[in-house]
Amino acid sequence: MVAPSETMARFRSFASRMGITRLGNITGLDRIGIPVAVAVRPNSRSVSASQGKGLDLPQAMTSALMEASEGFHAEEVGEGRHTSHRVLAANCNAVDTHLLCSTGQAFDIDVPIYWLEGFDLLRQEPCWVPAEIVHTDYTQPLDGYFLAGSNGLASGNHLAEALSSAICELIERDAVAVWSASGIRARAQRSLDIASVNDPDCRALLAKYDDADIAVRLWNVTTDIGIAAFVCDISDLSVREPRQLRHFHGAGCHPDRAIALVRALTEAAQTRLTYITGMRDDLLPVEYEEPPTADIVDALLDALRQESKSHLFHAVPTFAADDLGEDLRHELECLRSAGISRVVAVDLTRPDFGIPVVRVVIPGLEGDIKHPNYLPGVRARRAAALSR
């Protein structure tokens, strides 16, 4: 593993060439004290502000820098093919479009769209995927058939690290979607006993929330894939007016359950600072208005059911390895065992920068429920049906 300070030293010199004009520490804009940083890229073709979080400031600053670099790399994805799925699949391996996250717009296998070639990590063969779920140049018109966003876009010090991060993000988004579709009672039954959390880093983060008078609720949302995933909800105990009650969420996934929970805890703090700063281009004014009554009721009911503490931290599956390659192999085997047939990686690394960046596509997993065009897929619909 490479220390964040080493990563920063290696890649920060490329910041100006990637259009990153500012890298700042915004931790002090909130009282929690969990490090959060921002990288600003004004001419971005997607969002101009990227954020990072971590256990310490170097980790957060490096995280923000790398997220901004991912967006830059995904804006220029190289040459692809403009053809129909029928023609492409007759001569090449192509993903089953029925398994991709749809926007609801009917896909015609005879209509030409742009495709990019990737490599299937499970079948060890080339495989083509729709370009609109790879690139992030949203100044260009999208085909509009599939959910386009940053899900599955990741970077790292090594290709294996980038691939592992991308896969974990996709599994995390799938887990959150499946859990969210389950209904309030089923969700509450996945609550995590905070007292059972014995990892020192997690305890230190929980102490920061406690010192700041911030309530924390946790859920174990690990799915049949078997890679640890958590959701963290935070709310301000100093708020006395119900109409001002705000909840901020974070999620995390990693083979090592402690790292997964650290990611969820730090992301919740990052989300809260996102709303405090208002820096994200994709934040809408409606998100600052009063929360709907139904959301407040759900939050209160969940809080009451939190007392059941049905899941213990040590019971969550974990896999700790010192080698990133082992993490990656474990993730792929878990996906295969869960019935996933393809894990396609498109390498976006540029020789002139040397920063490993990938986009991973896993047909069959749920997408990001926060995406405005998200529609529940098979896994979410199944979870909803089982919870009725």
Spans of model-derived segments:
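Helix-biased "structured C-terminal domain" signature
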Residues: 1-388
